[in-house]
Amino acid sequence: MNKLILLILFSLSYCNAVIGQDSHIHFIEKPDSQKISIYIDQTLFTEFLYSDTLYKQVLYPIYTASGTEITRGYPARPKADERTDHPHQMGLWFSFGSINGLDFWNNSNRIPLDKKEHYGIIRFTGIKNINEKENQFTVEANWTNHNGYILLKEKTTYAFTVSHTKEAFSEPLH
């Protein structure tokens, strides 16, 4: 793939609370924890996780304005009576099922070593820009095979918006 441009728009409606027009989106970079925390006013909305132990970067957990977590706990923080299937489905993320025959969608730490050669890894390479004035941050990653050979270079800008009744973010890929 020479050029990949995709826009994903997710709109998360507020359950019990309404945010004022003058709400502020704030990013806190936490390099030691390998994450960027995204706050709306003083309330955590989500975190962009880019740990070396992940097979792709994710937004996790995601909360409503009333504080209800809308992402499941497993596999990061399993909850009582929660199913423990699909370890690759953590939070909100972007991936493909097949690029040059490699599965970037289903990869996780539960794949047997003898099957790893069939799976790709999205390796975080850096934060390019955090722009609170425009409510967005840009990150870069390499899509690699199990030996580290780079198939794609990704540059993603996460943009966040707040209105009276909903919050949203978009994730255009370049």
Outline where the language-model segments fall:
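Bacterial Sec-dependent N-terminal signal peptides
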Residues: M1-S23
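Extended, loop-rich substrate-binding clefts of extracytoplasmic carbohydrate-active enzymes
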Residues: H86-P172
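Generic structural motif
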Residues: C15, D41-T43, T53, A65, ...
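Contiguous beta-strand segments within globular domains
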Residues: Q42, P172-H174
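Beta-strand-rich N-terminal accessory domains
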Residues: Q21-G91
